[in-house]
A protein has these predicted regions:
Chain A
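Periplasmic/extracellular loop-to-transmembrane helix junction in inner-membrane transport proteins
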Residues: 1-20, 35-41, 77-82, 185-191
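Non-cytoplasmic
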Residues: 68-69, 146-184
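Interhelical loop and adjacent transmembrane-helix boundary motif
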Residues: 1-6, 166-206, 210
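Membrane-cytosol interface at the C-terminal ends of specific transmembrane alpha-helices
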Residues: 84-124, 137, 149-150, 210
Length: 228, 221
């Protein structure tokens, strides 16, 4: 059979969209969780981290329930946008975003917590409001962690299989991303197609991990306040 | 003019501060853990006292009785941190300019980065990053940055403790000069009694949150 590159394009689309969603949502949530104390914080923290430990099939099942034809958000989408989520690329994006979110969240939260609080205090004594402190001090100094989180989230989105299969299905040319294409090509005995995709995914994942490790060892910007 | 009388509960003791200062340098001296930094942080608004009142230039910035707690950014207090707390992601000049009041908000002095940098002899460092300058230079940048906000009170937390003896003596002299020039009250925390004697117009000894002695000196300028 002829090699199809469409799963690669679909995977890249899904991963990119998922990373944008994850970045926009995880940074404010991580900042809030790192900086504020509130009642029930531990419960919220556990819910946020849950997709990291739940089997993909459980996440897929939950997403189907919420975004399905009769699910609360599924109905809303139908009503507002006259479109459905299940068995579309949007479903694959949602599945990827949900599994990638905790990785990005953890990385950003740790990075924000590691910013020297004296620097933030110093900015306040210099007249800065909280938003200015966040955008001029906290965020730039947490940048290393944020970039690491983005790369991990992208890689995780690219590799998402179980939940994606359940909510977006296996529609070649429409929702069939790389991991799903590998599974079904292998099932159908098309080892040629499967092998090429396997090699691409493996090389890419290796490069991500290698790049992160190298970067972690590189000259890091000093996040301390220039202390002696 | 600073008038403050407040208490703050700490894990092992209760801190009580009773400070009155119109001009000159007040040296807060005492061993580690005596509560010196806590006093500065309460004055600046970085910590909240459990009881009391703080007035700066006749303006009430904290009162437990009336529920007043003016945010840090509106207290007009300069703060020099023990480890300088220079922003590592900004050049010396950007650090110094960070707290410059917006045009028109403070009409009494015309301050530019250039003359503050010059006053503290750090013009040549303006494009460097904090990790590219020495401890003494960091201290000058931290001072310049705090003064740039045109504070009505300057708090210095162990500003000279991490410096070598030579740099320390030079900076001690410069602090005295700076105070004479600037004419605002300075509160300086130190664990070194000699430094307190040398710099303080007034000395408060602190031990486990209690003020043990207040001495007013008349320093020969």
């Amino acid at each position: 059979m002829e090699f199809s590159y469409i799963p690669i394009i679909l995977s890249l689309k899904v991963a990119l969209a998922a990373v944008i969603i994850v970045a926009c949502s995880s940074i404010p949530i991580a900042a809030l969780m790192a900086k504020r104390e509130f009642w029930g914080k531990d419960v919220v923290e556990s819910i946020i981290t849950l997709p990291l430990v739940l089997p993909p099939s459980v996440i897929g099942f939950m997403l189907l329930y919420v975004f399905g034809k009769n699910g609360p958000l599924g109905k809303l989408f139908e009503l507002w946008f006259h479109t459905r989520i299940v068995f579309t690329l949007a479903g694959a994006v949602i599945a990827a975003a949900v599994v990638a979110f905790p990785l990005m969240y953890q990385a950003v939260k740790v990075a924000i917590e590691n910013v020297d609080q004296n620097l933030e205090k110093a900015a306040r004594t210099l007249g800065a409001r909280e938003l200015r402190v966040f955008f001029t001090i906290t965020l730039p100094l947490a940048l290393n962690g944020i970039v690491a989180g983005l790369v991990l989230a992208f890689a995780r989105s690219l590799g998402e299989f179980g939940a994606t299969l359940m909510i977006a299905g296996n529609i070649p040319g429409k929702t069939q991303t790389m991991p799903i294409a590998i599974y079904f090509a292998n099932e159908a005995g098309d080892t040629g197609q499967a092998s090429i995709l396997v090699i691409i995914m493996t090389v890419f994942s290796f490069l991500v991990i290698y790049g992160l490790n190298r970067w972690g060892k590189g000259p890091r910007r000093d996040t301390r306040g220039g202390g002696a | 003019m600073l008038k403050a009388h407040f208490k703050k509960k700490l894990p092992t003791f209760e801190l009580e501060a009773d400070i009155s200062l119109s001009n000159g340098i007040l040296a807060l001296v005492g061993p580690s853990g005596a509560g010196k930094t806590t006093i500065l942080q309460c004055l600046a608004g970085l910590q909240t006292p459990s009881w009391g009142e703080i007035n700066i230039h006749g303006k009430n910035v904290f009162s437990s009785q009336h529920g007043t707690d003016v945010p840090i950014r509106n207290r007009r207090i300069g703060y020099v941190f023990q480890d300088y707390a220079l922003f590592p992601n900004m050049t010396v000049e950007k650090n110094v300019m960070y707290g410059k009041p917006k045009k028109g908000s403070v009409p009494n002095k015309v301050l530019t980065a250039a003359n503050v940098l010059e006053m503290l002899k750090i013009e040549h460092l303006r494009n460097r990053y904090p990790n590219q300058i020495s401890g003494g230079e960091k201290q000058r940048v931290a001072l310049a940055r705090a003064l740039m906000t045109e504070p009505e009170l300057l708090l210095l937390d162990e500003p000279l403790s991490a410096l070598d003896q030579d740099t320390r003596s030079t900076l001690q002299q410069e602090l005295l000069k700076l105070q004479a020039q600037w004419q605002i009250p300075f509160i300086l925390v130190t664990h070194d009694p000699q430094e307190a004697e040398m710099l303080g117009d007034q000395i408060i000894k602190l031990d486990r949150g209690k003020q043990e002695g207040i001495r007013k000196l008349h320093r020969v300028q």
